[in-house]
Amino acid sequence: MRVSKYLLSTQKETPADAEVISHQLMLRAGMIRRNASGLYSWLPTGLRVLRKIEAIVREEMNKAGSVEILMPMVQPADLWVETGRFEKFGPELLRFQDRHNRDFVLGPTHEEVITDIVRKEVNSYKQLPLNLFQIQTKFRDEVRPRFGVMRSREFLMKDAYSFHLDQETMDETYESMFQAYSNILTRLGLAFRPVIADTGSIGGSMSHEFHVLANSGEDLIAYSTGSDYAANIEKAESPMPTQTRGEATQEMSLVDTPNAKTIAELVEQHGVAIEKTVKTLIVKGSSEEAPLVALVIRGDHDLNEVKAEKIPAVHAPFEFADEADIRKAVGAGPGSIGPVGLEIPVYIDHGVSVMSDFAAGANQDNKHLFGINWERNLPQAEAFDLRNIIEGEASPCGQGTIALLRGIEVGHIFQLGKNYSEAMNANVLDQNGKAQTLLMGCYGVGVSRMVAAAIEQNHDDRGIIWPDAIAPFRVGILPMNMHKSHRVQDMAEQLYKDLSDAGIEVLFDDRKERAGVMFADMELIGLPHVVVIGDRNIDAGVFEYKNRRTGEKQEVPFDQIVEFLKSAQ
């Protein structure tokens, strides 16, 4: 491809509204352009990368025995009503009506549609197991789209769905999808980690996420230093306390704390150890009888909202109560709330259950209680795992300790069980002629998100550093002063032809542009290999080669350049 015939829309300046490096570089490299909040057009450079990732995903799905189909982005709302997700999914589900006042949704996922297809097309055990996939645009009306294509409202996704009559074939397909995802990320040239995960709004039992490792990742991954255990922090089980509750040594006392609105301020101003404090958080309950619920964790711990949501009394989706409701129920505002005397249900973390002589809000503004003890000052509350695991704690697998790293989720696989098939009456006849409800699996890859994740992991201060497999072009040709030197022009044209004939994707910068601009653009868009041609190179009979990732430069004889670039890493 000649740059003169190409849309190379690079920018020198970093856009002010781009928060993360992938968003900045995708805009600067001319890969995408914003049309509206969370909506982007893919320009040629970005689309070439997107299509390469899509091709690798498709190849690995085909190898794993999945069969490609294509489902509509617009879905009948009736299917979502069947599964109960029309209301449960929340405002991320874009609902609308057609001219006949029929309800539709813009698909954020396709469980309902695929289950509807299978219940109509599959009626015998002889047609199972069945694994179907598509690569299709999705839409989720994110409350705050951000980070470019990392969290956009419209995105490209590969979603696969498998159907089974028995757990054995379900497990086999799940394992094949796990391996396919590992193969995809390996072929893309990305460092990644599969982790045990929560099933979220899709539901189901077993679940794994696939994370591209990057310091900018939104997700925290907890992994064992002594085994292959790894889990999303939302799912990682915190260790049970090993100590027993100590004896009470203090009387409970009410203390004025006018300047202590946070745990940190309470610790600093009143000399209490943070391990002897608790945070009491008021959240929405799941019933009319208990519209508010109190959750209590140790002052140095962080609430895990995913774990908390699994308590039956807690509203799903998880939501904190607003201050007006808190004051009406408790008589005080956030920062002064504690478990003593609360008239709403109280649930505590396991770590809180073994605390003694601890401090908490007094349910009066600007006051705290010190020297609180269970069963003396308040009844023992029901305990759950409500917190995030902490680096250095014992791993849930029993081997090693926990370390934390950041990742970007690009894939998620689930064993859904019968969640959707039961709701939609998806049954087939087994070998005995008896109707059986189908088991389902679900397997998603964020194709467009992978582009951003790859950049987050592969860049420097000059631009993107693409892995070879997904680079928009493998080689860039930079002819110096081509428009003033016929020798350089002829040599560049011949090299362009030779590389193209050899099946190597080339971007030939034939612009009448300064060398500095040409070099900057090639580094910005991240081509793995660059060949420089100048009069001095021609005199010496060599091309100047530069490797984008290593910065290595070397001279390559004219007659060796094609084979050299074929094997260059």
UniProtKB/Swiss-Prot annotation:
Catalysed reaction per UniProt? tRNA(Pro) + L-proline + ATP = L-prolyl-tRNA(Pro) + AMP + diphosphate
Q: Which UniProt keywords apply?
A: Aminoacyl-tRNA synthetase, ATP-binding, Cytoplasm, Ligase, Nucleotide-binding, Protein biosynthesis
Q: Where in the cell is it found?
A: Cytoplasm
May I ask which residue range the UniProt record assigns to the signal sequence?
Answer: none
Q: Which cysteines are joined by disulfide bonds?
A: none
Which Gene Ontology molecular function entries are recorded, alphabetically? aminoacyl-tRNA deacylase activity; ATP binding; proline-tRNA ligase activity
Q: Which InterPro entries match?
A: aa-tRNA-synt_IIb (IPR002314), aa-tRNA-synth_II (IPR006195), aa-tRNA-synth_II/BPL/LPL (IPR045864), Anticodon-bd (IPR004154), Anticodon-bd_dom_sf (IPR036621), Pro-tRNA-ligase_IIa (IPR002316), Pro-tRNA-synth_IIa_bac-type (IPR004500), Pro-tRNA-Synthase_IIa_type1 (IPR023717)
E.C. numbers: 6.1.1.15
An example GO biological process term is: prolyl-tRNA aminoacylation
Source organism superkingdom: Bacteria
List, alphabetically, the GO terms of the cellular component aspect. cytosol
CDD domains given in the database record: ProRS-INS (cd04334), ProRS_anticodon_short (cd00861), ProRS_core_prok (cd00779)
Q: Which family does it belong to?
A: Belongs to the class-II aminoacyl-tRNA synthetase family. ProS type 1 subfamily.
Subunit structure, briefly?
Homodimer.
**NCBIfam families membership:** PRK09194.1, proS_fam_II
Q: What is the recorded function of this protein according to its Swiss-Prot or TrEMBL entry?
A: Catalyzes the attachment of proline to tRNA(Pro) in a two-step reaction: proline is first activated by ATP to form Pro-AMP and then transferred to the acceptor end of tRNA(Pro). As ProRS can inadvertently accommodate and process non-cognate amino acids such as alanine and cysteine, to avoid such errors it has two additional distinct editing activities against alanine. One activity is designated as 'pretransfer' editing and involves the tRNA(Pro)-independent hydrolysis of activated Ala-AMP.
Tell what the record comments on domains.
Consists of three domains: the N-terminal catalytic domain, the editing domain and the C-terminal anticodon-binding domain.
UniProt name for this protein:
Proline--tRNA ligase
Name its species: Shewanella woodyi (strain ATCC 51908 / MS32)
Its encoding gene is what?
A: proS
